[in-house]
Regions:
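PIN-domain endoribonuclease scaffold, especially VapC-family toxins
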Residues: 1-85, 89, 103
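Acidic, PIN/NYN-like endoribonuclease modules and their adjacent C-terminal/linker elements
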Residues: 84, 88-115
């Protein structure tokens, strides 16, 4: 699929949370401050990267989708479901390499551009 001029990309706040938790856990595991330097650098790069996108909130509409779908999609991870519900609430296409899990979400439009 070709990207056309003017197309915009957005990222779910839940995706940002996942990435932040990963780097914060890495920083917390390091006992030596000198070893935390690179992880803090990477965390800073992450902030700058995500700042280039529109950030989609996990709002009341997304939460309502989440509450409605939680019971029927128990095997879908909480964060993946939050990401899916954010996309549903914003009525956007979700780009993912994880088609198998996300295609179970009713009404969610997904594509894998890595295929």
């Amino acid at each position: 699929m070709a990207i056309t001029y003017g197309e915009r990309f957005a990222v779910s706040i839940a995706s940002i949370e996942e990435h932040m938790r990963g780097w914060l856990a890495t920083i917390a595991k390091e006992r030596l401050v000198v070893r935390q330097v690179n992880s803090y650098h990477e965390l800073g790069l992450l902030f700058r990267f995500f700042a280039t996108f529109t950030i989609l909130p996990f709002d009341d509409v997304a939460a309502a989708h989440f509450d409605r779908l939680r019971q029927s999609l128990r095997r879908l991870g909480t964060m993946d479901l939050k990401i899916a519900c954010t996309a549903l609430a914003a009525d956007v296409l979700l780009l993912t390499a994880n088609r198998r899990d996300f295609e179970r979400v009713p009404g969610l439009r997904i594509e894998n551009w890595l295929d």
